[in-house]
Design a protein with these regions (language model features):
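Core structural elements
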Residues: 148-156
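Short amphipathic alpha-helical interaction patches enriched in hydrophobic/aromatic residues
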Residues: 45, 128-135
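Retroviral integrase
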Residues: 1-126, 156-181
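Short, charged, surface-exposed loops that flank catalytic or proteolytic processing sites
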Residues: 132-145
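Residues that form generic nucleotide/phosphate-binding pockets
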Residues: 69, 127, 131, 149
Length: 181
């Protein structure tokens, strides 16, 4: 029997307001890197392409992405992420301390402990792959439409869409919205 038994991960906070708790992750698809974040209450999804080889990569890029989120949605109480180098860098830890943000790392032994981020990555990858044109490049208008549909699609459990939870109303679009998620 190993001397270091695996202990279950620290339980995430239960958010009561939108963007009080968010889950974040990075992923790679078709030669591009993306930062994805999801509000744990509403399911609101944000996807940002990260330009490798610029100041958008690494911890500096993570902090730029988080500042954009905070300027739009407010300062979260808790951010959940994996233990990737961007999230565990000294600069990131200092940023979280300065802003009073609790950083919850998912366990390598319990990857599902950051399930909201994993679901966000899966959704973002599907949207990106579904909206690549014949030339192989991303159709940005189609991607925006996909995000609008995602944000307007009601959750089967609570019967509200991320937009309804966050804004109190659906987003204005000019196309039908699916009621299935």
């Amino acid at each position: 029997m190993p001397s270091h038994a695996r202990s279950p991960p620290i339980e995430p906070m239960i958010p009561t307001t939108p963007f009080e708790a968010i889950a974040c992750d990075y992923f790679h698809l078709n030669g591009c890197y993306y930062f994805v974040s999801a509000d744990r209450l509403s399911g609101w999804l944000e996807v940002q392409q990260i330009k490798v080889g610029t100041n958008e990569a690494g911890a500096k890029g993570l902090l730029m992405a988080l500042r954009r989120l905070m300027a739009t949605f407010g300062v979260p109480t808790e951010i959940s992420s994996d233990g990737g180098p961007e999230f565990t860098a000294h600069e990131t830890k200092t940023f979280f301390e300065r802003w009073g943000i609790r950083h919850r790392l998912s366990s390598a032994f319990f990857p599902s402990s950051n399930g909201r981020a994993e679901l966000a990555v899966k959704s973002a990858k599907r949207m990106l792959m579904d909206n690549v044109g014949q030339s192989g490049s991303l159709n940005t208008d189609a991607m925006v439409r996909a995000l609008l549909v995602h944000r307007n699609t009601p959750d089967p459990g609570c019967k509200l869409s991320p937009a309804q939870v966050l804004l109190g109303r659906p987003l204005v679009t000019h196309f039908p919205v699916s009621t299935k998620k």
